[in-house]
């Protein structure tokens, strides 16, 4: 399977590559597919929950906990307590 253009683009530009188009490679940054995505549904979110050596979103964690106490991906016990490691972004209240 190669890259295919629509008939309109081929008629206008021929079979040559269009200038300014950047080819997609498999060397994507880890942020697009890596550890900060839910390994069950690949949802990207800052509110992911650590499970073993990967992360799960709250929806997938809830679904897995309704079926079993162990992770379906890494077979380790699922987290039952959420620990927030980031400090609040708002400044402290000073009256």
Swiss-Prot record:
Function comment: Plays a crucial role in virion assembly and budding. Expressed late in the virus life cycle, it acts as an inhibitor of viral transcription and RNA synthesis by interacting with the viral polymerase L. Presumably recruits the NP encapsidated genome to cellular membranes at budding sites via direct interaction with NP. Plays critical roles in the final steps of viral release by interacting with host TSG101, a member of the vacuolar protein-sorting pathway and using other cellular host proteins involved in vesicle formation pathway.
Protein origin, superkingdom: Viruses
Main subcellular localisation: virion
Any GO molecular function: RNA binding
Topological relation to the membrane, as annotated: Lipid-anchor
Annotated Gene3D superfamilies: 3.30.160.310
Species, as recorded: Allpahuayo mammarenavirus (isolate Rat/Peru/CLHP-2472/1997)
The gene coding this protein: Z
Name recorded for this polypeptide: RING finger protein Z
Keywords: Host cell membrane, Host cytoplasm, Host membrane, Host-virus interaction, Lipoprotein, Membrane, Metal-binding, Myristate, Viral budding, Viral budding via the host ESCRT complexes, Viral release from host cell, Virion, Zinc, Zinc-finger
Comment text on domains: Late-budding domains (L domains) are short sequence motifs essential for viral particle budding. They recruit proteins of the host ESCRT machinery (Endosomal Sorting Complex Required for Transport) or ESCRT-associated proteins.
